[in-house]
Amino acid sequence: MAETKKGSESYPIKTIVVLVQENRSFDHTLGWFKELNREIDGVMKSDQKFNPGFSSDLNSHNVVFGDQSQYVDPNPGHSIRDIYEQVFGKPWDSGHPDPNPGPATMSGFAQNAERKMKGMSSAVMNGFKPDALPVYKELVQNFAICDRWFASVPGATQPNRLFIHSATSHGTTNNERKLLIEGFPQKTIFESLDEAGFTFGIYYQCFPTTLFYRNLRKLKYLTRFHDYGLQFKKDCKEGNLPNYVVVEQRWYDLLLNPANDDHPSHDVSEGQKLVKEVYEALRSSPQWNEILFIITYDEHGGFYDHVPTPLDGVPNPDGILGPPPYNFEFNRLGVRVPTFFISPWIEPGTVLHGSNGPYLMSQYEHSSIPATVKKIFKLKDFLTKRDSWAGTFESVITRNSPRQDCPETLSNPVKMRGTVAKENAELSDFQEELVIVAAGLKGDYKNEELLYKLCKKTCVSDASKYVTKAFDKFVEESKKARERGGDENDIVFCVDDDDDHNVVKPPPSQSEPSHATPWSN
């Protein structure tokens, strides 16, 4: 592991650790934590939040937001079409698209859920009591949260995860098969750090989603990927964490290795275990007094939130528009999501509200991560117009000296799910996307019949095995390419499993997005 380079003299932070969980809104996860800290813009029994069962029906009953969330089995809608209805209270009409949908009333969550499945509004219109999430309860009490952090896109997982490290999704709002195979071409914060002489590391438990980015597939970055189980605690203990750390989760729910990404219908207690494990490893590290640990969620997953999504002043990052039928302009944000800041330089019980710039309409959103990384490490350039606009959160570091009272351990979460993992379940959209990326690396992307079978006819357990094998093959062949003296900027993928020299450099992609049409179910 390369030596961790000193950060900016203006800040005590030398290592930033990022963990991005899946598909939970702020109110669903932390709304009821207002009972612990009135500073939080959440919910209380004395100020009920609700949605009409159907916003177009004046006689429709109201669905009140409750605090009874435990194990959530249904997977609510969270496509760009679903979120339009959730935010504006009316369904998207492809025949008469509305360029000015009006205010973000946040009134369509219940009706969208019922449209998906009768009774689903009960899951969507409920949140967790603080005691149900004991790890988060202690983090809220001991460190900082932000109650004005929004997803970068009112869309699903993939585009929002792309924004986290590159401040753009390169025009994608859904499953862009061609770009998944080739890799998204935009510059990332990883390259900015590397160019400035800083180090980064990706600690994966399953297939690393950072391979969505084409440039992260280069030979020179192969050594930046580390097996979480083998390396993370070791690097923490030995003080060898790099300047920028990304912890990736288990995305597939298996009997022996349950998913810990918080995506419904995965057990949130497994995500709590992961957060606890990461925190305790960081807390025991000799680097603890130089660490800022950030936890956020990629998007809200269709769960209710009462804070209107920002509609004004949001810049398109790079001038690229989304594909038909939405032709999204990337000029409004997604729904509010939970975000934590953890460091001994933060006062306990801190709540970060709206951004203080750099522009009047700036907001905290996923592009705030590369924007703040740039600021703390004094990097040269922004990635896009979006991170140059996004609020930065270095102001959460307020102390003149590190605290000595940060808890060394966190509470043990209690299992919520009474059943076992559904290894034979169909794949979620995001799990399909991982399969497509894996097929690109393994060389199976040219076999249309096989690719369709992998995405639409494969269960969770088999998909997990496939992506793991594909990644292992990618690493193996990349090592061979390096040993043969391959250029460090080469990007390799396998074309024939029976050939020991099956590495080629893919042709460069066009800069414009392909907007490939995904398969229909």
UniProtKB/Swiss-Prot annotation:
Transmembrane segments: none annotated. PANTHER family: NON-SPECIFIC PHOSPHOLIPASE C4-RELATED. Keywords: Cytoplasm, Hydrolase. It comes from Arabidopsis thaliana (Mouse-ear cress). It is found in: Cytoplasm, Cytosol. Gene3D superfamilies: Alkaline Phosphatase, subunit A. It catalyses: a 1,2-diacyl-sn-glycero-3-phosphocholine + H2O = phosphocholine + a 1,2-diacyl-sn-glycerol + H(+). Residues 478-487 have a biased composition (Basic and acidic residues). This is Non-specific phospholipase C5. Pfam families: Phosphoesterase. Non-specific phospholipase C (PLC) which assumes minor PLC activity during inorganic phosphate starvation. Can hydrolyze both phosphatidylcholine (PC) and phosphatidylethanolamine (PE). Required for normal accumulation of digalactosyldiacylglycerol (DGDG) during phosphate limitation and may contribute to the conversion of phospholipids to diacylglycerol, the substrate for galactolipid synthesis. Belongs to the bacterial phospholipase C family.
